Amino acid sequence: MSAVPEQILGASSANDADPQETHEWLDALQGVLAAEGPARAAFLIDKQIEYARVNGVTQPFHAETQYINTIPVEQQARIPGDQDIEHRIRSYTRWNAMAMVLRANKHTNVGGHISSFASAATLYDVGYNHFWRAPSEAGGGDLVFVQGHSAPGVYSRAFLLGRLTQDQLDNFRQEVDGKGISSYPHPWLMPDFWQFPTVSMGLGPIMAIYQARFMKYLDSRGLAKAGDRKVWAFLGDGETDEPESLGAIGMAGREKLDNLVFVINCNLQRLDGPVRGNGKIIQELESEFRGAGWNVIKVVWGSKWDSLLARDTKGLLMKRMMECVDGEYQTMKAKDGAYVREHFFNTPELKAMVADWSDDDIWRLNRGGHDPHKIYAAYKAASEHKGQPTLILAKTIKGYGMGDAGQAMNVAHQQKKMPVDAIRKFRDQFNLPVADDQLEEVPYITFPEGSKELEYMRQARQNLGGYLPARRQKAEALPVPQLSAFDALLKATGEGREVSTTMAFVRILNTLLKDKQIGKHVVPIVPDESRTFGMEGLFRQVGIWNQEGQKYVPEDHDQLMFYKESQTGQVLQEGINEAGAMCDWIAAATSYSTHGVQMIPFYIYYSMFGIQRIGDLCWAAADMRSRGFLLGGTAGRTTLNGEGLQHEDGHSHVFHAAIPNCISYDPTFQYELAVVMQDGLRRMYAEQEDVYYYLTVMNENYEHPEMPAGVEQDIVKGMYQFRKGVENSNAPRVQLLGSGTIFREVIAAADLLKKDWGVESDLWGCPSFTELAREGHDVERFNLLHPTETPRESHVAKSLKSARGPVIASTDYVRAFAEQIRPFVPRRYVVLGTDGFGRSDTREKLRHFFEVDRYWVTLAALKALADEGAIGRDKVAEAIKKYNLDPNKPNPMSV
């Protein structure tokens, strides 16, 4: 049995009333460690702490450990394989990653990052050679979130394996001509390569957490086996300041996601300077993650420190490691061995430890993140750990190998070019076969066919199931119900029976859940608003998923719709957590690619807390080619009438219109919703189009009419004729457009126009101004590029072609929403909207305040007719008086 280390005995001797007793306790613990191992020792310590607390002993909580490696040398798993070959592969990968950025920026300013992958090369190399499995017959493979700025290194490895060509590398960040590769991981741009977009920073970590949990969801519901699959997420230490990076780590700990591994590349630098110059980011992150219930493995020092630490019998080296702040550590790696000797080994005792070392020996003291032996041991421990997610904190050097051109320098992140001298030093450090006269060119280097290095790389990936990154683009198509399955919603609700479009959605959802072929694929997601949307019936019907089941008797267990949690439940209940719910939705919406099984997610939320709050995740979902339905509930500026400024959504459709593969609709009637959702199911799950849907639904109850005959395709296109005015009438005529609940005000305005002013109206439901605008712009583009062909007509122009009179549109959204179609309206076009701050009041008063109700629509129609000379202007003045409209009323935009 080895003796208790002196640094432990001496650490608190000044406050030790009985050193002999302390020695005996530590000797006893050492005996347990030697005879029964660390697990038994940890158990006994936990029991002692528990007993002490019960008996009133208080002690401060220390979430951080010493600034040394978590895994002792004697417990370090030995890395298999040929490390000389792996080092050469890693060196080639480093060079080509650097060359790619330098070559791309010789004649352009497209940018790119050298320093991030330079610091992380070993972290990725060990994973690709030994751990990360590709999808295969044996299983679904591991999911790897590559930190975005390290993309050049992943391309470099793919190039060495023959997966990418030199032409593609030379067109890094130059994609328009179809030859290039994307700046960061973008599945939209490289759909068979990248799986997960990890830029913007912070999105990768939170998405990885929910991917890991969704893997458990699929497994417990019997839809896809999780087995020992893992989700690996790589992020930078500076990235952890993004709220999304750490915002969900508590959930991961609480849910015991032992299929999740975070690897944080702690190169101590962010874009402008140190991450924590006056502190220690590794210690800070260790505390946060341990406090959240994670298993934390620190990989701080490389093997070249092992002998020094073994000789540190008094703990002076560990003390110095602990007191030295990150700003100092960074500076030391930007200098040289002499500087490190002077400033790190800064006491006589420490200097004596390296007295017989040269400055070069000191300079070669490596960091853990650059040591494949230490990284392998950490990865293996993480892969085998049960009951907790694991965090690996790997200390590295930003710009490793860049020398005077960037190593550990504050400018490292922005370096896109390097002088020849720096390139020469890089070549020499990694012993690469590039001649001096080639350095200016920075050529790519490869392993010849049949070389042991190339065969080694291929065999490593073959052993792990195939190449990564790789992305599956299709899964088995689902049998989508015909529109007739929703026949009840195509009929009128009947006199006196009022429902909301939210209620109609819940009815459609229930129909799908009960469908024998696709019901199990439906994933309802709600952020603590099921009762708001009338969905509490799902609690008992399909249950709320919880991998621990339900360990308590719910308060409402004797009621029909009691709160039921189950290991096989179907509803994902996220609590007040829109970002988490959106990540749930993304995991389900990309399940066809990540797990080979199509899932149909429906995420319903207050529309104001959708894209306005988690817009970057909506863009990431688009990039990932997500398929599913987002539903903005209580949508529109005036529909959520009592909540006030922050809660009233007048712009979500405008935001969603910017996302190219997001298809959005604002339906008024239940038949519109049924038609749109059935068509969406067909497009996404039968045809497997890479689109997703945003639908707004309301909580306002009213009667719904029967669907007019033959309008299904026009509803999908975004505009259909709801009702035609009296034909062959010589009366003045207008075309009235609307969507959502405000279309009902437009219908009422048509009645006022006829009754009070003798004006005929044709009524057009416009469930998607966005789709109308997209189709219109596409038609315009075709006509621009095909001047000698018969011009095409947009759906808007075609619909209004034979109609007469000015066109007036009113919606519950800002004017920009309906303004989208102005270029395609073939006559005078007037748009009403809810521009301005929201406020609380009744719906009637709010609609009057925002000037979108039936009276303002009527006034706008009369004014448009007067402007065209169809009626006198005195009629407009008369209407203002008749409807008690205040000419001096403030513009709602200004108050």
From Swiss-Prot:
Component of the pyruvate dehydrogenase (PDH) complex, that catalyzes the overall conversion of pyruvate to acetyl-CoA and CO(2). Signal peptide: none annotated. It is an enzyme of class 1 (oxidoreductase). Residues 1-20 are annotated as: Disordered. It comes from the Bacteria. It catalyses: N(6)-[(R)-lipoyl]-L-lysyl-[protein] + pyruvate + H(+) = N(6)-[(R)-S(8)-acetyldihydrolipoyl]-L-lysyl-[protein] + CO2. Its cofactor is thiamine diphosphate. Keywords: Oxidoreductase, Pyruvate, Thiamine pyrophosphate. Gene3D superfamilies: 3.40.50.920, 3.40.50.970. InterPro entries: PDC_E1_N, PDH/Transketolase, PDH_E1, PDH_E1_M, THDP-binding, Transketo_C/PFOR_II, Transketolase-like_C_2, Transketolase_N. Its EC number is 1.2.4.1. GO terms for molecular function: pyruvate dehydrogenase (acetyl-transferring) activity. The lineage of its organism: Bacteria, Pseudomonadati, Pseudomonadota, Betaproteobacteria, Burkholderiales. It comes from Cupriavidus necator (strain ATCC 17699 / DSM 428 / KCTC 22496 / NCIMB 10442 / H16 / Stanier 337). The keyword Oxidoreductase applies. CDD domains: TPP_E1_EcPDC_like. The gene is pdhA. Pfam families: PDH_E1_M (PF17831), Transketolase_C_1 (PF22613), Transketolase_N (PF00456). Homodimer. Part of the PDH complex, consisting of multiple copies of pyruvate dehydrogenase (E1), dihydrolipoamide acetyltransferase (E2) and lipoamide dehydrogenase (E3). This is Pyruvate dehydrogenase E1 component. Disulfide bonds: none annotated.
